[in-house]
Amino acid sequence: SNAVEGLLNYRFSKRIKEQKTKLRMVIDWFENQVVDKGWNAGFNKFYPDIPTIGCRGYIPSLQYLCSYPSKIEYNSGILPATISVIGKGFIDSTREFAAILNVENSPAFRFKHLWNESTAKPDSNYFTILVALSIISEESFNILNLVNEYLKTIDSNNMRFWVKPHPAMSEKELRNGFDNKWPEEFFIIQGLSSEYIPRSDIMISGMSSICLESMSLGVPVIVVENLRGLSYNPIPEEVPQDLWRPCRTPNDIENEVEYYQNRSDEEINRHKEIGLKIREDYFEPVTKEGVRNFLMLDLP
């Protein structure tokens, strides 16, 4: 269980201290779960003089409360000395329950591709909708069913639907799990999402970090909400709703697709500017200087 793993992490730091292992710094993939608490409690006790960093290298949902540390946790010594986030826009929200926390901006390693220069753009012969599915099967099939129902109400001759399954789901599992006959308009794509986002006009997805990625490239997102539980919205509250819309029904999808499909060139350019601001605020570029600062290495 996680509790046992947390204890093992604690004892790991104790054992390597007993072996007189010298450490310069400690970095933990930080979600502030039990395993992290054991890890940080151990290194704070047995290596009190070295820097400990909790690397929050992901986009936290507002409902993923464990990733927002409390002052009690800080006072209990179970947090890293520094929490690194992937963009300056995440700093204030990370301190929501403990203003005393040392939170620093660091390179967004997993999202380095967002800063790669690309000439890719949507095919003007189609209106391309990228349907990005979740790791949660139930959520993925709910998204597909809604899009399929929407598909029945429109003329889709000039529309193209790219269905991108989560890497944890095979194409066979996707087709077999879909209740209805697989629509011929649905094209399953493989490979990296980053290859398809710039070539899409809009994206339809669920509660996934790919939503903020898409918006940062100026590609609008229709976010399908969860009707059977909490909706883990991955979009920070500070992000304007210009580039995203929540939806629950096929009619919602129809309305929002129509809105984004009929944007003027001026509106599209304005949305790209908003996307650049999102990228600057929430995805710190990976640079040599940024990496050396993160690793506390002396700059040349």
What are these regions (language model features)?
Residues R24-M25, T128, R160, D201-I202:
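Structural motif
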Residues D281-P300:
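C-terminal alpha-helical cap of glycosyltransferases
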